[in-house]
Each structure stands twice: as C-alpha cells, then as structure tokens.
Amino acid sequence: MTKLKNEVTSLESKKTSRRKFFKAAAATGAVAATALAMPNISVAQSAVTLKMQSAWGPADADPFFTMNKQYAQKVEALSGGTLKIEVLPVNAVLKTAEIADGVSTGVVDAGHTVTAYWYGKNPASSLFGTGPSYGFSSQELMGWIEYGGGRALYEETLKATKLDYVGFFAMPMPAQPFGWFKKELKSLADIKGMKYRTVGLATNVLQGIGMTVLQLPGGEIQPAMKTGLIDAAEFNNPSSDRNFGMQDVSKFYSLGSFHQSQEMFEIAFNRKKFESLSKHHQNILRIAAEAANTDNYWYALKRYSDDLNKLVTESGVKAFATPKDILAEQMKSWDKVIADFSAKDALFKKIVDSQKAYAKSVMKYLLLNQPDYSIAFRNTFGDPANVKV
C-alpha cells in the first residue's frame, strides 16, 4: 500500500513538473513572438543615419541620382535598417566643387561624386577616373585600384591634397561620348578653335588639340551652349545629356572618345565619422559599393541605350562615330600632358607608372584573348551606325 502511494505521488509530481515546463515555454514563446512582431522598435532606436551630399539630381530623371540612391538602398538592406543614408540632391548643402572639402571637414557625413571634381586641388585626382587609358576601360581601372596598388596611391593622393576622408569606388562607366556639336564632325580641322566644355585632365588634352576649354557644372552646360558661351560640350552619357536637354540645342552627337574613356563614382565618408561606426557598418559601406558597382552598370547600359534610341528616333539627333584622326590626336595630346605633369609631380608620375605596369600585363591578356565582339554584332545586325532599334 505504501509502495502504491509513493508511485502515485511520484506520478503527480512529474505531471506538475511538466505543467510548469510547458507554462514556462509558453511564456518564453510569447516574449519571442512579441519581439518578432515588433523588430523595428530596437532598430529604429539604434539606427545611424548619414547625410550624403550628391553631385547629382535632383530627380530620378538624372540617372546618376538614381544610382546614388541604389547605393543608399543597399546600405540599408545589408544593415537590416541599422545604417541609413539620407541622399541630398545636388546643391542641397554643398555645390559640386565643394563636396570633397565638405566631406573632409564634416559639413556633411559623405559625398557621392567623381574625383575629377577636385581636379583644381590636385590634378592627380583625375588619374582615379578621367585619366589616360593605356588600353584599359573603367573595369580594368577599378581592378588596378583594388588589386594593382591603386588604393594605396589613392590614399596617398588624398593625404597630399589634405582631404581627410575614406573613399570607395563604384560604377565602371562606359566611355564618354565626345559630345554635342553644331555640325557633324568630319576631321580634326572641324574642332580647331572651338569653345568646348569638359573637366579634369581632359581640359589639358583637348586644349592640346586646338580647342578652347571651359569647365562648367553639368546643369550649366545646356544654357551655355544655347547662349553661345560654348560651341560644343560633353557631360557623360546619353541619359544625362537627354535630361539636360542637349537635344534642344544640338542635333549632332559624336560618340566614342579618349578624352574621358573611363570614370567611376567616388563615394567618400568623413574619416572621423567613418571610424566612429562599428566595424560591421564600416564593412557594409564598403560591400554596398561593390554591390552597387554591378547594379549601377547593368542599369546604366539599359538606360543609356534606350535614351540614345530616343534621341535619334524622337528628337532627330544624328549619332556618329568620332573621326579617327581626332582620336589619334587625342592620344598624342595625352602623351604630352602625362609627360608634362609627371615631370612636375613625383606622385603623379608614381601613379602613372603603376597604371602602365598594370595595363601592360592585364590588357595584354585581355586584348589577345577577347575576340572582337563587333564582328559578331555586324554578322547578326550589320553596321552599328545603320542599325535601327
């Protein structure tokens, strides 16, 4: 009898323990469910927001502004909302030429721009975007930065220019058109004495082939051409040009040029602000630039080609290839410009020598290995100049 009583007591004790366990589990589950149902409360309290001055905009009609926002979206997505970037459209706080200094001094936390915009502070800046080709495109130039010693030289250039920020690069831009003219170009003689807009080292290169060059912000190009301040101009791509309304002041669009055959965005962060972030957030800012690098490029190719077709079919623009004698003269002028600057600036020469060494190796492989894709295009569609889309 005593044995049976003890067994009953033991069984009831086990049942009580199980009930306590399930009650505790249910309470824990309720807390977890509540936390899952309200994940944004803690995120919102701990989120860091960086103010980024863009050199582009103010609307999505500007493809570069869209690309800037794509970067910001990737930062927020990768961080789970704990790191955000407020993208400020062009001239919101700083003018385009002021972005580098403004980021360096902390007027804004970050900037989305190109290195050519601080060319006036140091001509070597243009070598990290709008420099000579040596056979490579923007893709290979960015490869040099990350795998050919370019990043250390970029940091050295920032230090020499007294710019205190951390920079990343994104978006390997296609070669820029030679630009908009009052008539179709037939030869080098057609551009002699012409008043032309560009930026960076291209100003020196095109002065060397007989053009008179002015440096103007993007938004001032179309009005300057309309009033006759300049005779011709380039900016960057068919989409930006169409957004500026270049088709309203010119009907002749010269495609293909070595004046700026490669460029990419510089994404700059004030150094103190950057170093105050967690290592996790610092890595996100870097990795987001690498992700935007691909996304921006895919987006650009589709949009640029669509807008070129619209310029031709809807606005009556004649798109034509830049005459070969102009391209040849550009290369000669580049040689002289690079030699002149290298003789005056040891750092400039150091950068050029590094780029040449990288290009000599990498481009030998690519040029020997890559087929001429224009052969395949012509086989399928015909002469690109005559293909209607």
Question: Model-flagged regions — what are they?
Answer:
Residues 1-17:
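Secretory targeting signals
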Residues 15-141, 156-389:
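N-terminal secretory/targeting leader peptides
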